[in-house]
Amino acid sequence: MAVPARTCGASWPGPVRTARPWPGRGPRPCPDPRGPASGPARPLLLLLPPLLLLPLLTAPGASAYSFPQQHTMQHWARRLEQEIDGVMRIFGGVQQLREIYKDNRNLFDVQENEPQKLVEKVAGDIESLLDRKVQALKRLADAAENFQKAHRWQDNIKEEDIMYYDAKADAELDDPESEDMERGSKTSALRLDFIEEPNFKNKVNYSYTAVQIPTDIYKGSTVILNELNWTEALENVFIENRRQDPTLLWQVFGSATGVTRYYPATPWRAPKKIDLYDVRRRPWYIQGASSPKDMVIIVDVSGSVSGLTLKLMKTSVCEMLDTLSDDDYVNVASFNEKAQPVSCFTHLVQANVRNKKVFKEAVQGMVAKGTTGYKAGFEYAFDQLQNSNITRANCNKMIMMFTDGGEDRVQDVFEKYNWPNRTVRVFTFSVGQHNYDVTPLQWMACTNKGYYFEIPSIGAIRINTQEYLDVLGRPMVLAGKDAKQVQWTNVYEDALGLGLVVTGTLPVFNLTQDGPGDKKNQLILGVMGIDVALNDIKRLTPNYTLGANGYVFAIDLNGYVLLHPNLKPQITNFREPVTLDFLDAELEDENKEEIRRSMIDGDKGHKQIRTLVKSLDERYIDEVIRNYTWVPIRSTNYSLGLVLPPYSTYYLQANLSDQILQVKLPISKLKDFEFLLPSSFESEGHVFIAPREYCKDLNASDNNTEFLKNFIELMEKVTPDSKQCNNFLLHNLILDTGITQQLVERVWRDQDLNTYSLLAVFAATDGGITRVFPNKAAEDWTENPEPFNASFYRRSLDNRGYIFKPPHQDSLLRPLELENDTVGVLVSTAVELSLGRRTLRPAVVGVKLDLEAWAEKFKVLASNRTHQDQPQKQCGPSSHCEMDCEVNNEDLLCVLIDDGGFLVLSNQNHQWDQVGRFFSEVDANLMLALYNNSFYTRKESYDYQAACAPQPPGNLGAAPRGVFVPTIADFLNLAWWTSAAAWSLFQQLLYGLIYHSWFQADPAEAEGSPETRESSCVMKQTQYYFGSVNASYNAIIDCGNCSRLFHAQRLTNTNLLFVVAEKPLCSQCEVGRLLQKETHCPADGPEQCELVQRPRYRTGPHICFDYNATEDTSDCGRGASFPPSLGVLVSLQLLLLLGLPPRPQPQIHSFTPSRRL
């Protein structure tokens, strides 16, 4: 019988689908099915009503068999559902475990998590912790100002007059080519003994402070020696602070001269290469030294700016960008006759890490041409700063102009935009070696409350691109006590190895009189800082009473997370803060945007939302219900949130009887403790215990067997009410040990696992116990021993029914090894316990299926046999039969796919070793059909904390921060020779002996060779999850003469999709694969140019000091130059070039003449 042709748009009862005529029968008006996988239309499939899938539609080459009818496949699905449910009822022991809990009701209490009370208590505890650090900060800042005020400046001070511990001395003394070894150290350097201190993750000495001085600052200068002299008195204040608060970590004074004095003393963690650390460029120092900034950088790219000068400008702009933090806003433009932005950003944008990277890359593309037009550059900059339609800092406003010089003062522009109020500061930078008159540049800066700087060579860049902060600090200093505001930073990596920290900062002012009369000094002395480790804040949050899927988080005014379980940067750069937005830490939706805004505004709130969450292994998406509760943390810029699933409203707390507690016996004598001993494993199953901090003296270990051994040894000495142990954790562990042992006794021990092809049965609990039976199955158990960190545990709690988890397979790895019957599929389900009106889920139970045996069972259940022992039905030429998954596995593909799109079971023997792979890697054509028919939907997100393999080497070495490799054109350029000669004279004469090692080429950065280390990057993630289709569907994959019929149906009470399809007969059905594997994003995630058009809500610090009527702007920079003798310089340059060894360009560092305070 011929099947009537159907035109596009034909429909049948149920969801309407775009259809095509049966292949080869009638017109083909539909679009090409091999088009894009996504888009507004999905014309790939023809869905047919069940009545049309008649036995007459036979598969080619199998005339006696037809594609199974829908009711047949639904029957197979029911058989699969019944088999799974039966095995789980017998072996899972859900009902029996409920009864065990109720039988032991006297051993535990049910406690309630009250979100509002919890979050307010934690916020109060964090506030108290930070307040203690604030008090210590204030004592330090006050003391520092008094010490400096009382200090008498010494012009004739010598190095040997100063005793201090040089934090880099030990490393330098080990290096025979170090600065001190080469010139002979004149300092009276202290040599200290150190003790290991776990709290600091370092060796420390509590009796002294340590001093770190940047490599490019001369230790013996008068300014530095005087700084060391007066700051020595801080040592006693540091020590007293620690006496009052033993929990204090690093206490640091960062001086405006570049000196860092910190307590307790510890050797500097200098890399083997050059140490580029300068406290003045650290995020916490910059935040404490000035108020937020709106900055426009304009760069002269006229024709006179070429060669070395243009390269100096590019490097200077990049260094300037590094002085900005997330509270600042910036744009960069180039100008000649006209001005234009260097990047895609057309207005001020937040100076976050990703935006600054866009600027830095764009700056490298600047080309010199045309004539200088200061007017165009300044008008563009003022227009940018006057744009009120965008988010910005709304505090300090400034223009930074880099040029090689010019005659125009553009007074008319300043009169129009900036005078008489002069709300915008203008900083001018004369770049390169030239003979231009710099008076106009000085005038621009001096008449607009700015400063004039000269950058004649590479060595002057770092110091001269950061000293503008001293000018911005003037209003803060003049404001006096009003400006004494403690600020808390973003999260960043501690330079001394403490890990992730936040720092409280307080500016330190110069209280001395400046000059004759009562003129007040305007200079900032530096910034005082105290670190707080994130781990110390985390300890104040409830960990295990919130359940596996409950957590506490905190954000700042930028929306960046301070605390969050997903804040786990794999690579950290100590120069930049760790900035993970709350909406990037979770899967973004409108509800979370509202929560984030409310928290930034400092409001309280509570909201229950339905949202998507990513599984711990980042392979699955679940739709869940979460309760969010949040409050501000007083006296800080942080806000605290609590997230609880409804089933975590209650939790169990073990209640060991008073009689046992009064005995004062070791815990090892308690009832049920014997079931933790390895001697019981053979009969009771293997026990894994979560590696939690049960007691202070418990030695941690990544090996669970070793950890269990350490735990048992300690329990031989500890009593149940010991003060050194966490009784909640300890008692719940003992309780769950006994509970799970009774499950073995009542259910598992009497069952024959082999009968049902099971490799193991298991139970995991909130108390931290994972019991696997039989004991031998533990050898192949690969799940995390901490249930709260096990994906199967967390997903089972969030989903009802049976959750299948196939073994994880990466497409790049070799297929599964099926030998020795050790490969299994986990099936787990949560145990829901109702006690009165209180419902909770304290445990998860499950089985581990033998993959190969269940693959055979799967074929039988999806066949025309009623049971396994029945012979296969034979279908002769004269009779008509439906195909099934057992007899016709050469023509019919039958698979079970989980809700993430991963293969669980197949009737194809050659696919057994592909179990656990994303199904698109197994059958791309069929997976695309399932996606296009809404059986699956997908969620794309970005991982901003990923680590990527090193990129192929390009321009490596320490050179990016300042080494210019001259071209042939530069050698022929007289200006380059003059510049290079002048710098070489300065560099060689002053530092040739001191820093000899710098002139030895080393193709590595200061932190180590980029060829051998991973770098931080952004990865795009795609997860698939079940779509809106719950019914049983039949469809056809239309691809010319090779169309395929398929049927798909969700299995009730599981996370499985049952799919039956014709096997593809030719390559015409080949289509592009859907990708699930994480992929690298070269552009650092979503297009930044588009994102800045939709900026996320934020607010800056609530304080701003950008103006003071008493500010003295007369100190605005004065240029100085000397007329070079060209003959002498060229001769000297030739001599120096000939004297250098034939090696790559040296790493050049600068001498920085410091100013007297």
Swiss-Prot record:
Post-translational modification as stated in the protein's UniProt record: N-glycosylated. May be proteolytically processed into subunits alpha-2-2 and delta-2 that are disulfide-linked. It is however unclear whether such cleavage really takes place in vivo and has a functional role.
Cellular compartments per GO CC: GABA-ergic synapse; presynaptic active zone membrane; voltage-gated calcium channel complex
Descriptive protein name: Voltage-dependent calcium channel subunit alpha-2/delta-2
A Pfam family annotated for this UniProt entry: VGCC_alpha2
Leader sequence residues: 1-18
Recorded family membership: Belongs to the calcium channel subunit alpha-2/delta family.
Motif position, MIDAS-like motif: 300-304
Cytoplasmic topological segments: 1141-1157
Positions of the Cache domain: 488-577
Topological domain spans for side Extracellular: 19-1119
Quaternary state and interactors: Dimer formed of alpha-2-2 and delta-2 chains; disulfide-linked. Voltage-dependent calcium channels are multisubunit complexes, consisting of alpha-1 (CACNA1), alpha-2 (CACNA2D), beta (CACNB) and delta (CACNA2D) subunits in a 1:1:1:1 ratio.
Gene3D superfamilies: PAS domain, von Willebrand factor, type A domain
Subcellular location(s) of the protein: Membrane
Bilayer-crossing regions: 1120-1140
Function noted in UniProt: The alpha-2/delta subunit of voltage-dependent calcium channels regulates calcium current density and activation/inactivation kinetics of the calcium channel. Acts as a regulatory subunit for P/Q-type calcium channel (CACNA1A), N-type (CACNA1B), L-type (CACNA1C OR CACNA1D) and possibly T-type (CACNA1G). Overexpression induces apoptosis.
Keywords per UniProt: Calcium, Calcium channel, Calcium transport, Disulfide bond, Glycoprotein, Ion channel, Ion transport, Membrane, Metal-binding, Signal, Transmembrane, Transmembrane helix, Transport, Voltage-gated channel
Sites where the protein binds a divalent metal cation: 300, 302, 304
SMART domains cross-referenced by the UniProt entry: VWA
Keyword Ligase: no
CDD domains per UniProt: vWA_VGCC_like (cd01463)
Start and end residues of each VWFA domain: 294-472
Disulfide bond entries: 446-1104
Pro residues: bias regions: 24-34
Principal cellular location given in the protein's record: membrane
